[in-house]
Design a protein with these regions (language model features):
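Von Willebrand factor type A / integrin I
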Residues: 1-24, 28, 46-48, 71, ...
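An amphipathic, basic-hydrophobic helix/alpha-beta surface used to engage anionic
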Residues: 12-270
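Glycine-rich, flexible loop segments associated with nucleotide phosphate handling
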Residues: 84-92, 278-288
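Generic recognition of short, well-ordered alpha-helical interface segments
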Residues: 179, 239-242, 281-291
Length: 355
């Protein structure tokens, strides 16, 4: 009797070994996705790691392995993570999967420094019932997270900025009833109810307001220059990007429409941004600016004069704010032309000065 039990057990093991073979790897699908593509420094977000069994057989052993850039910090001490020699953080999960099922693991993480962070290919493995064989594969899907710059720590420029914006805002009283309609933009909560377009809002885009083209509505261009010969260009450029964030946030709060441009190459187009953002207001517009600033490198896109030359058009009521690392336009004729076309409403902020 015991012999029959032993034989049955051996046959069962062999059957399970065959059914759980590593050739089932082709039935597996793995992916990892951040739940936010744009985050603030030290903001906690999640990496969602999924493993799916597309086949008709049980997978008795499966493993997911993620290697995170050393800038990542895992926020949950219960997550199985450890540091490897390269400075990266290795995260590993083991599980089993019934047929046509999937499992998901959520890992809370954060990043302190501004920049673009690409996720390394996700490694997933399966093994047989006896643990004698194991096969692995990499998921090659591209995933990235953009970390925006911090708010400016030294906001000594705030008083100068406030005075400048006050001068720009005065122009809203030049004409009382402007009525030239040019389009729609996202409602920010500061526009009068009569400006809301209920027809456009009903299309499912959220509350939309009419854009009126008139000199009474203040407008600003925020320009960030990365063409500099300053000695400490890295820290100064980081300060420029932080100043730009703070300035754009103030413009959003005051309801002053603005466009944005940065004279720098972008590290990646992962977030779908460009180094210019058209005029607008609202959460989506501000997010586009932050995405641009998060991707900005220390490499200039053009010379400083070439960058400014793109804005040499009659500005009307538009003011210009130029943020630059140092005294980079001391002898620039282009800057003087821009000042003339702006009617004098040009504010130059240098990162190496406390203002």
């Amino acid at each position: 009797m015991s012999l029959l039990v032993a034989v049955a057990a051996v046959l069962l093991v062999l059957w399970m070994q065959r059914r759980s073979g590593v050739d089932r790897l082709a039935d597996m699908r793995a992916d990892h996705t951040p739940d936010a593509k744009l985050v603030d420094p030290d903001e906690t977000f999640h990496l969602d790691m999924t493993l799916q069994n597309m086949g008709r057989h049980y997978i008795l052993f499966a493993q997911l392995e993620e290697r995170l850039h050393q800038a990542f910090t895992v926020r949950d001490p219960d997550i199985p993570a450890w540091e490897v020699r390269s400075g990266e953080t290795k995260i590993s999960f083991s599980t089993w999967l019934p047929p046509r099922r999937q499992v998901r693991f959520r890992v809370p993480v954060s990043i302190s420094a501004r920049g673009v962070y690409c996720l390394a290919p996700l490694k997933f493995s399966i093994g047989d019932f006896l643990g004698l064989q194991e096969r692995s594969r990499l998921s090659g899907k591209f995933r990235a997270v953009v970390v925006a710059p911090k708010e400016a720590e030294d906001q000594g420029f705030a008083d100068v900025l406030g005075g400048f914006l006050g001068n720009v805002s005065v122009r809203r009283f030049i004409h009382e009833d402007p009525a030239l309609f040019t389009g729609f933009r996202e409602y920010t909560g500061r526009e009068p109810m009569k400006q809301i377009s209920w027809y456009q809002s009903a299309k499912g885009r959220g509350l939309m307001v009419k854009i009126l083209d008139h000199t009474a509505e203040p407008q600003v261009s925020v320009l960030v220059n990365a063409d500099t010969r300053a000695k400490d260009r890295g820290p100064l450029l980081e300060k420029c990007y932080s100043m730009a964030r703070t300035i754009c946030r103030v413009l959003e709060e005051r309801g002053i429409a603005y466009d944005f441009a940065v004279n720098a190459e972008l590290a990646s187009s992962a977030a779908g941004t460009d180094n210019t953002v058209g005029e607008g207001l609202g959460a989506n517009h501000f997010a586009a600016v932050l995405g641009c600033l998060g991707q900005a490198t220390y490499v200039r896109a053009a010379s400083g004069d070439e960058f400014l030359a793109e804005f040499l058009v009659p500005a009307g009521a538009r003011g210009h704010i130029l943020i630059t690392p140092s005294d980079d336009f001391a002898a620039s004729r282009v800057l003087e032309l821009l000042r003339e076309l702006s009617g004098g409403t040009l504010l130059v902020l240098q990162a190496d000065r406390s203002v």
